[in-house]
Amino acid sequence: MGRMLTHKDLIIRLHLQGHTTLEIARQTHHNPKSVDAYLKTFDAVLILHLYRVPPALAATILGHGANLIDEYHHIMRSYLKDPEVMRDHLTARGVKLPAQALHTG
């Protein structure tokens, strides 16, 4: 049996499909600020991944537990498999990354 879809999975999937924060909030019965918080944490995990920051250190930097960071990493691997796709996502979100931030492995 596979992994269960969490509200984080759903929120991020809807975002990656192009839905707005308000649309996601309505569909998931979340406050728009909560939706934005999930997306902001997801972006932060992506950035740290692209800079090759180990998950345990990312947890410390972001002030979240290692299990939460692992969950975001799983979501990241499910939806944004290629580092270029990760960079494109972050660029679309207004994040400017230098070329050397590209994680290739």
Map each language-model feature to its residues:
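Long, charge-rich, low-complexity intrinsically disordered regions
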Residues: M1-G105
